[in-house]
Amino acid sequence: MEKSRQFDLAPYIDHAALDPATTREAIATCCAQALHHKFVAVCVYPSALSQAVELLRGKKVEICAVIGFPSGASTSGSKLYEAQEAAELGATELDVVINLGLLKDGNTEAVYNDIAPIVEATGLTVKAILEMGRLTESEKRLAAEICLDAGVQYLKTSTGWGKGATVADVRLLHQISQGRVGIKASGGIRTVEQAIALIEAGATRLGTSRGVELIQQQQQLWEQG
């Protein structure tokens, strides 16, 4: 309980609305919740950007679009187009899934060229999603180094569509990046205790669709004294 007093979770939360069946009503709710709780960002599909931008225009909430999500297996050209279109629609941040197949093939140049043009062309905050639950220890390190070289601003653990964030993976990314970029933990974050453990390991953002639940849990702990 004491640790729950040390962190206000709201400024860490990227409030996600990434169910494939997400409706306009759900996007409106997501944006309203982000405003009410002062979350740092909402995270949506590109098709929901216009609505999110309209609802959050002039507000202190970042608008993040996912790119190549969730597989990362789109062509590099299509990812670049998707990213540029998202930027034109008003996204302020991009969560881009790397190509895991290229990484596992050892084609490091292609992995770099899948990400770097997006960073350069859009000028937005780019978070590279490594999907660490699918990688070996050496692949995790390699993926992180490639993305750092590509100029991303964040390393992100997972899409949330597989194995979610672990303290060990966040700690590894923090060790590799040495403070050069932010770390976003995402996937399976359901409790305040999990959230705090990830922050203590080095996470600077938490990607979750359960942001409101986490805030409610934390408020209950505060009220219990």
Swiss-Prot record:
Pathway: Carbohydrate degradation; 2-deoxy-D-ribose 1-phosphate degradation; D-glyceraldehyde 3-phosphate and acetaldehyde from 2-deoxy-alpha-D-ribose 1-phosphate: step 2/2. It is an enzyme of class 4 (lyase). The active site is at D95, K156, K184. Gene3D superfamilies: Aldolase class I (3.20.20.70). It catalyses: 2-deoxy-D-ribose 5-phosphate = D-glyceraldehyde 3-phosphate + acetaldehyde. One of its GO terms (biological process) is 2-deoxyribose 1-phosphate catabolic process. It is found in: Cytoplasm. GO terms for cellular component: cytoplasm. It holds the Pfam family DeoC. Keywords: Cytoplasm, Lyase, Schiff base. The keyword Lyase applies. One of its GO terms (molecular function) is deoxyribose-phosphate aldolase activity. Its EC number is 4.1.2.4. The keyword Cell membrane does not apply. InterPro entries: Aldolase_TIM, DeoC, DeoC/FbaB/LacD_aldolase, DeoC_typeI. Belongs to the DeoC/FbaB aldolase family. DeoC type 1 subfamily. NCBIfam families: deoC. Catalyzes a reversible aldol reaction between acetaldehyde and D-glyceraldehyde 3-phosphate to generate 2-deoxy-D-ribose 5-phosphate. This is Deoxyribose-phosphate aldolase. It comes from Synechocystis sp. (strain ATCC 27184 / PCC 6803 / Kazusa). The gene is deoC.
